[in-house]
Design a protein with these regions (language model features):
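N-terminal beta-alpha supersecondary unit
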Residues: 2-81, 110
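Glycine-rich beta-strand-to-loop/alpha-helix junction loops that act as flexible
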Residues: 77-80, 97, 133, 259-268
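Conserved phosphate-binding catalytic cores of ATP/NTP-utilizing and phosphoryl-transfer enzymes
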Residues: 1-2, 107-128, 304
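A contiguous, well-structured pocket-lining segment that forms one wall/lid of small-molecule binding clefts
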Residues: 181-259, 268-277, 281-282, 309-312, ...
Length: 336
């Protein structure tokens, strides 16, 4: 294998190494997920986990693909946004790899990487992105040389909301997949269920969203004695409908005809179904990459690094500091 970009992802609970060939062919990542024994993600504990598993994961990637300084074109890493201690681990590893192999270093925007891996894997060209993850919920579209944030959460990300609700019920991290399962099982057994029976707040404010209200209301429903599966179904229906409504408004506003799903919550089959129905009604097309490329992964970092290197963009070591508060629209886009 020749001419590859290696990507290092470490923004939150996942440390991941992936690679993409310069011709655009992507390869699965080597990843390790930090799972806290209780509560949510503790940044320093997650960073300790990343430090402990980094050497083994990287060695596995190097050995499988026979990587060396002769076939690596660049090292890309998540420069932000994310949890500071976690970002520092990935940045430190990436700098060491760049220096050791004497290849360019490329600091990339984690949010933009979700867009570019989605574009490359699905073939969509100029989509509206519904970006739904633990720490982020944004509706994004390209405008000139930026990916513009058209709408976003005003409090917590939808993934964090689902994980917090799951934790309140004693469901371990990550809670989203379990909520999806409980919701599906309950709905299958109650096909005529009505949302009015388990109503929750609707969280759209113009083009923005918030999820703390729906979280508190869902817990109140549990305290009132409602079935957990029923509340899981309701919380998904309400939260996803809000996201899809904002995405639909963005499609109408921009005139674009492609909707792309990205982020860990984009793995949810019910959300995909709702996006597909809405897109068909608008005569648009909904896209999403394979689930392994929706969750945080090193391959998406490598893909954005590849596009940047091909555009002659790289990062000097002295400019490679992490930026935990980096926003999607802070990155200038000069590639197609």
């Amino acid at each position: 294998m020749e001419n590859v970009v290696v990507g290092v992802e470490s923004t939150a609970h996942t440390l991941s190494f992936g690679l993409v060939e310069m011709n655009g062919r992507a390869h699965p990542s080597k990843s390790s997920l930090f799972r806290p024994e209780e509560g949510g993600i503790h940044p320093r504990e997650a960073a300790d986990h990343h430090s402990e598993v980094a050497a083994g994961l990287l060695s596995s990637l190097v050995n499988e693909y026979k990587l060396n300084s002769n076939n690596i074109s660049a090292i890309a890493f998540s420069q932000g946004p994310g949890l500071g201690p976690c970002l520092r681990v990935g940045a430190t590893v990436a700098r060491a790899m760049s220096i050791d192999w004497q290849v360019p270093l490329v600091g990339v925007n984690h949010c933009v990487a979700h867009i570019e891996i989605g574009r490359s894997q699905t073939g969509c060209i100029d989509p509206v992105l519904l970006y739904v993850s633990g720490g982020n919920t944004q509706v994004i579209a390209r405008a000139g040389d930026r990916y513009q944030v058209i709408g976003e959460t005003l409090d917590i990300g939808i993934g964090n909301m689902l994980d917090k609700f799951a934790r309140m019920q004693g469901i371990p991290f990550p809670g989203g997949p379990k909520i999806e399962l409980l919701a599906k099982e309950w709905k299958d057994n109650n096909p005529n269920a009505n949302l009015e029976e388990i109503s929750l707040p609707y969280s759209v404010q113009g083009m923005d969203l918030n999820f703390s209200g729906i979280l508190n209301a869902a817990q109140t429903r549990i305290n009132e004695g409602n079935d957990l599966g029923a509340v899981c179904w309701s919380i998904q229906e309400h939260a996803f409908a809000a996201c899809v409504e904002v995405a639909e408004r963005a499609l109408a506003h921009t005139g674009k005809k492609e909707l792309l799903l990205g982020g860990g919550v984009a793995c949810n089959e019910r959300l995909r179904q709702m996006c597909e129905v809405m897109s068909e009604e608008r005569e648009c097309i909904a896209f999403w990459p394979e689930k392994k490329y929706c969750v945080d992964n090193g391959t998406m970092i490598a893909e954005l690094g590849r596009r940047m290197i091909q555009s002659e963009l790289s990062t000097e070591i002295k400019n490679s500091s992490i930026n935990p508060s980096l926003r999607t629209d802070h990155t200038t886009i000069i590639w197609e």
